[in-house]
């Protein structure tokens, strides 16, 4: 099948096969056909989000060496970037959250390292929730959790979570594919919306691996999917593998959008860039505090972007902005029509396996 036939399938609302996704991923990032893929992804993203992009903002409640062995992460003890543990006070956490709320972030994310005590995370979260407006969307970015803990997150006032099955999970990490998937499904069972991503993409990942991960993220109807490249942590073993270009990342962002059902409104990329936005990304993150892609303890002094900078990148890419609580994490008002559309997509996806 040629590229135009695949794009015509997308325009008709048909589910792309894994072979279709591999075909699109196999194009040279700078060839004319890839720019056609960008245009189609941009069209879909603007259609499902009414042309309005979102900026979410994340702060870390702690910084500590972690034993989960994620080779791409600056928190990993094996990488030796950070050697001491630090934790925000309740007041500092509330201040960060209010800062993001005041700057107009569409969702406020609380992140912890994977082994941070869950009950302590909840204690901080409850103070943060009390300090925010009721309508502010609060999201958790935590390690794998049981269904019981997922319910506690929901009860504490979280609308959703960010959670991903990472590329080569269990090879480049000490975690298992099964534990990551179980957490995703437990979060959903608890009533939390789940945002995810195809990440962290490196030069070594094959088009078949990427297509399989795109299909997996589509399979559970996330709040958003998307793609993010691996950022090299200086001095680490995995940094020797190199990094993909922003253009290649934008290509993967675009193909991921084409692989999602249109019930998925969001299409993310990280780190924020105009190429990603042109290729259909409608979600960026601002960050403060610890950041798993940064060697600075305060990423606002390193790689982290601000809410305003993220907005400017979108505007430079001809996106309008959404003001108000995140639509990606608050899909309930459209649940009935979404369920019907999702059922059709899911059935088509299963029939192609």
Model-derived features: where do they sit?
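Auxiliary Fe-S-binding modules of radical SAM enzymes
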Residues: 1-29, 218-353
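Helix C-cap/helix->beta junction micro-motif
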Residues: 48, 132-134, 190, 220, ...
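Catalytic cores of alpha/beta
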Residues: 146-153, 203-217, 270-279
């Amino acid at each position: 099948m040629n590229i135009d036939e695949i794009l015509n399938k997308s325009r008709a609302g048909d589910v792309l096969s894994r072979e279709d996704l591999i075909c699109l991923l196999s194009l040279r990032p700078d060839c004319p056909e890839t720019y056609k893929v960008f245009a189609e992804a941009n069209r879909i993203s603007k259609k499902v989000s009414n042309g309005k992009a979102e900026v979410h903002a994340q702060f870390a409640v702690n910084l500590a060496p972690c034993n989960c062995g994620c080779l791409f992460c600056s928190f990993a003890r094996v990488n030796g970037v950070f050697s001491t543990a630090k934790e925000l006070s309740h007041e500092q956490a509330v201040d960060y959250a209010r800062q993001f709320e005041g700057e107009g972030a569409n969702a406020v994310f609380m992140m912890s390292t994977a082994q941070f005590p869950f009950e302590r995370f909840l204690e901080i979260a409850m103070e943060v929730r009390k300090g925010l407006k009721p309508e502010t969307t609060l999201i958790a970015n935590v390690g794998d959790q049981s269904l019981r803990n997922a319910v506690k997150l929901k009860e504490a006032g979280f609308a959703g979570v960010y959670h991903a099955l990472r590329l080569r999970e269990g090879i480049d990490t000490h975690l298992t594919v099964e534990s990551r998937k179980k957490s995703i499904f437990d979060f959903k069972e608890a009533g939390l919306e789940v945002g995810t991503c195809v990440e962290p993409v490196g030069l070594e990942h094959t088009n078949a691996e990427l297509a399989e991960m795109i299909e997996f993220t589509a399979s559970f109807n996330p709040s958003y999917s998307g793609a993010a490249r691996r950022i090299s942590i200086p001095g680490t073993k995995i940094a020797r593998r190199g990094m993909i270009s922003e253009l290649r990342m934008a290509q993967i962002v675009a193909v991921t959008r084409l692989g999602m059902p249109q019930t998925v409104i969001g299409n993310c990329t990280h780190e924020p860039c105009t190429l990603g936005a042109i290729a259909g990304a409608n979600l960026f993150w601002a960050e403060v505090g610890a950041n798993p892609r940064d060697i600075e303890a305060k990423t606002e002094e390193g790689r982290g972007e601000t809410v305003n900078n993220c907005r400017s990148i979108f505007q430079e890419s001809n996106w309008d902005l959404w003001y108000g609580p995140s639509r990606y994490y608050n899909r309930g008002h459209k649940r009935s029509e979404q369920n019907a559309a999702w059922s059709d997509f899911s059935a088509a996806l299963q029939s192609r396996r």
